[in-house]
Structure formats: structure tokens, C-alpha cells
Amino acid sequence: DTEKVWSMTNAAIEPEWAIDELPHLLARRHHDPHWARSQGRVVGSEQISLFGLVLAPKKPVHYGALFPEESRQIFARDALVTGEINTRAGFLQRNLAMLARAREEEAKQRRAGLIVDEDWQAQWYLDRMPPHVHNQHALDAWYGKLPAAEKAKLEWSFDDLIVGGVSDAERFPKHLRLGDVRLAVNYR
């Protein structure tokens, strides 16, 4: 009798079974790489499919293990430049303080674009870090082994951050004297 449906499913499987037992038949696609401060590394999503059937749509993966160069770029841009990293490397806090000082100078001069952009900052870090540094653990391990002279080379100077040269401090004083009164001046 072929008029009746006898079974809706003949062989139900769990996706994990196919992923574990058939790795040679699986297609993997990686997407959405981003910096995860809590994990201290670049993470992404992996879509796993078997002959077009999606078994795992968004499996979290350590992106740096798969694509170290791209992870290194993201690490420099989203972790180091922004300071969104929990690191023991002391240069980063000093660089962020120097950047704040440069932004203050930019406000004094009332000139947008006085400070180097984030792309320059990221490239500056990339030029000084070895290729294997693309996560917090690797940064801390590498930085911890550096001699003091090499650690100092990772710190920005004020002149590094200013595009148009250093300002004239006399033109933009931090204090203004009116008679016997000394007033603090803030530039916005």
C-alpha cells in the first residue's frame, strides 16, 4: 500500500553525532570576528554544515587559532587602541594617558584632526609586536620577557600622536592671571 505515509522520519540524528563522526564531510564557514574582552582574545562564529544542511549555525570559536593575521589586526584596533583589554603590560595605560593629553592639546587649539587616527595607532602597535601576538595571554607573555629598553619603545611620545607638530604652550596657557587672581583655563 503506497497511499499512506508510514513514517515521518526514518533515521533521526543529533547534529553533534555528525560533527563528531563525519568531520571529513563537513563544510565550515567562519564569520563575525570581534574582540571579546572577557576572554582576552578575538572570537568568531562557525557555521557547520553537512551537504548544505546546517548542523551548527553559530558555534563560538577562537578566531586567532584559525586566522591569526586577521585576529592580530582586530586585536590591535579593538583591544590596544581602545584600551579594552585587561593586561599587565604597563605601556598601554601610559599610552592612553598620553593620548588623553594629546586630546587636551587638540581641544586647546580647537583643531580637529590634530591627533593621529586610530588606523595609525593600530599600525604603530602592529609594527612593534611579533606576529604571534593576537590575544591578551600572548601579549602578557611576550611583554613580560622584554628587557626594560625594549618595553620603553612601546610607549608613545607626545610628538608621536600630534600630526601638526607640538603646540605653542604660551598661546594656550593652563592658567590666566587677572591682577592677583590666578584662574584655571579649560579648553573645549
What are these regions (language model features)?
Residues 1-188:
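C-terminal accessory domains/tails appended to large, multi-domain proteins
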